[in-house]
Amino acid sequence: MPHILPEPSVTGPRHISDTNLLAWYQRSHRDLPWREPGVSPWQILVSEFMLQQTPAARVLAIWPDWVRRWPTPSATATASTADVLRAWGKLGYPRRAKRLHECATVIARDHNDVVPDDIEILVTLPGVGSYTARAVACFAYRQRVPVVDTNVRRVVARAVHGRADAGAPSVPRDHADVLALLPHRETAPEFSVALMELGATVCTARTPRCGLCPLDWCAWRHAGYPPSDGPPRRGQAYTGTDRQVRGRLLDVLRAAEFPVTRAELDVAWLTDTAQRDRALESLLADALVTRTVDGRFALPGEGF
């Protein structure tokens, strides 16, 4: 990043201008269909499940077909677990798909097929934590609640606190920081999604594009971009991990019309047989794979 001299000493704002941020968002936001008007609370909840630890570009390849196929909780609940796992494809973390299916079943059965709008009820649903509950309350039901992801924490750390990164999460502190920034109720949802977009596309972790930032004041810029004083960031490994092996084994089962033999599964990962065995046992324990009475393997519900 080019060095920019600190600005003259001023009393720094402890807010972010919603006018500037919302105007920038209208000009520059990505075309993400789950943010469009008319998207149902259920379809927003589906997007939040998919976006957990997954880039939006990968979700774009799955979400539109998913919500056309299963537009409501009841439609999703009637699908088989195997169909849900197949449709989830290579989004990763397939337990999310299973939990989404369970969540749909609970909403259809206990909530008259309507996604609850109360955060305290939302967090009782399978697979729904505090962040997802708040995202649904904000984006589906337009409530003025803080929605704090990694991108939001980074923007607040830099613009408000003058730090290169946010450090370790603290839910009470992070929620209080964002709640203090939220404008009045009518524009709070747009402000929240714009803050996320700013962190995802401009105020990024490794290569922030400060020249494109719409904020007219940033404490980090004002301080001369001090580097992080925390430990070096580590990239999240995938190659060679148990996650990769689990994915390879599930790929075999998703492609199979009938249960497969152990030998057919074994060829999916020949590098480390102990790791392969461990990955298979974990899939069985998570009920993402079933073993038939004759010792073959299948997706849940297909072990005939």
UniProtKB/Swiss-Prot annotation:
SMART domains: ENDO3c, FES. GO terms for molecular function: 4 iron, 4 sulfur cluster binding; 8-oxo-7,8-dihydroguanine DNA N-glycosylase activity; adenine/guanine mispair binding; metal ion binding; oxidized purine DNA binding; purine-specific mismatch base pair DNA N-glycosylase activity. This is Adenine DNA glycosylase. Binds 1 [4Fe-4S] cluster. The cluster does not appear to play a role in catalysis, but is probably involved in the proper positioning of the enzyme along the DNA strand. Residues 111-139 form the HhH domain. InterPro entries: DNA_glycosylase (IPR011257), Endonuclease3_FeS-loop_motif (IPR003651), HhH-GPD_domain (IPR003265), HhH_base_excis_C (IPR023170), HhH_motif (IPR000445), MIG/MutY (IPR044298). It holds the Pfam family HHH. The record marks 149 as: Transition state stabilizer. One of its GO terms (biological process) is base-excision repair.
